């Protein structure tokens, strides 16, 4: 057995990535589960309740099948077990990166607990109401109190952003709570934009189908155009960052959108903007190297 450290954590990530690829290629779940257990043992990873639960459910399902029991929901159960293992492997990868990857390690917040959405909502709603109440304050106290309110709000949003950024796989319930907060008309639009950006960046750090669906929901339901565009960029980039073939609910959510020509045109425009951004630095270098010197030298240039 080998303990994970700064010298071998990338090998571990390559191993788990290979297992996820095997799941995406529809290789037998039992085989991938056995390999997962072996890799966890090889690297002295502690036992995990979720992995044990997946293994127990798979063995029970297999046992009933071998006994000849008919179960119309077996295929659906099998697919959900595959999804659970894929997401668990993604979570394990993130945990290892947070421990050993120098870049990711700098992003981990001091408060590593899961975001308390109710507490965040109360803090942001209180900011809006307190800001409105400033109109009743004496003029000489307004500036000082406004500064205090914005500092408190900055601390709240900074903590929330970092907690979302480094979070693992979300449950549907947690994602719905976040989405409801982002779409709430009570909080500031800038806060909603920041939270959407945090979800997007979290999805880029560690692919999560639930976060993709959250961003899709915000895109569909947001009334503010800036928030709508932020969500569009978020789910497009997040969707490109992971292998979501095992999650047909994402494909089903996209079907009605892709049937809309206006939406397809919007996607094409976004792709063009990305291409232009990618080539902007090269274009600048070309202008500075080839175009500007000729303009400077040609003093008789006629316009």
Region locations from a protein language model:
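Cullin-RING E3 adaptor/co-adaptor recruitment helices
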Residues: 226-227, 303
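Long alpha-helical HEAT/HEAT-like repeat alpha-solenoid scaffolds in very large eukaryotic proteins
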Residues: 238, 244-302
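Alpha-helical solenoid scaffolds in large eukaryotic transport, assembly, and signaling factors
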Residues: 119-222, 234, 238-246, 279
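Extended, helix-rich scaffolding/adaptor regions
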Residues: 2-139, 151-155
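Residue-level detector of extended alpha-helical repeat arrays and alpha-solenoid scaffolds
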Residues: 192, 228-229
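Positions within ordered alpha-helical repeat solenoids
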Residues: 38-41, 60-67, 87, 91, ...
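Hydrophobic core segments within long, regular secondary-structure runs in both alpha-
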Residues: 55-59, 209-216, 251-255
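Solenoid-repeat scaffolds in large eukaryotic assemblies
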Residues: 28-32, 228, 247
């Amino acid at each position: 057995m080998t303990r994970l450290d700064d010298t071998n954590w990338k090998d571990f990530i390559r191993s788990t990535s290979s297992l996820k690829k095997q799941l995406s290629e529809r290789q037998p779940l039992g085989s991938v589960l056995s390999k997962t257990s072996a890799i966890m043992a090889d690297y002295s990873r502690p036992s995990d309740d979720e992995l044990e639960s997946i293994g127990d459910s798979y063995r029970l399902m297999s046992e009933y099948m071998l006994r000849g029991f008919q179960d119309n929901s077996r295929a659906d159960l099998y697919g959900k077990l595959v999804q659970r293992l894929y997401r668990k492997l993604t979570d394990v990868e993130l945990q290892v990166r947070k421990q050993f990857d120098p870049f990711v390690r700098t992003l981990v917040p001091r408060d590593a607990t899961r975001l308390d959405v109710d507490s965040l909502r109360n803090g942001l709603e209180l900011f809006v109401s307190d800001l409105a109440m400033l109109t009743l304050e004496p003029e000489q106290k307004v500036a000082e109190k406004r500064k205090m309110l914005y500092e408190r709000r900055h601390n709240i949003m900074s903590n929330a952003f970092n907690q979302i950024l480094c979070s693992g796989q979300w449950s549907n319930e947690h994602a719905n709570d976040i989405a409801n907060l982002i779409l709430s008309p009570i909080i500031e639009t800038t806060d909603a934009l920041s939270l959407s950006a945090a979800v997007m960046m979290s999805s880029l750090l560690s692919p999560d189908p639930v976060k993709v669906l959250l961003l899709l929901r915000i895109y569909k339901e947001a009334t503010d155009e800036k928030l709508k565009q932020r969500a569009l960029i978020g789910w497009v980039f997040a969707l490109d960052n992971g292998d979501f073939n095992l999650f047909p609910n994402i494909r089903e959510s996209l079907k009605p959108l892709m049937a809309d020509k206006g939406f397809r045109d919007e996607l094409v425009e976004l792709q063009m903007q990305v291409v232009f951004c990618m080539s902007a630095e090269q274009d600048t270098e070309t202008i500075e190297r080839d175009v500007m010197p000729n303009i400077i030298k040609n003093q008789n240039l006629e316009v």
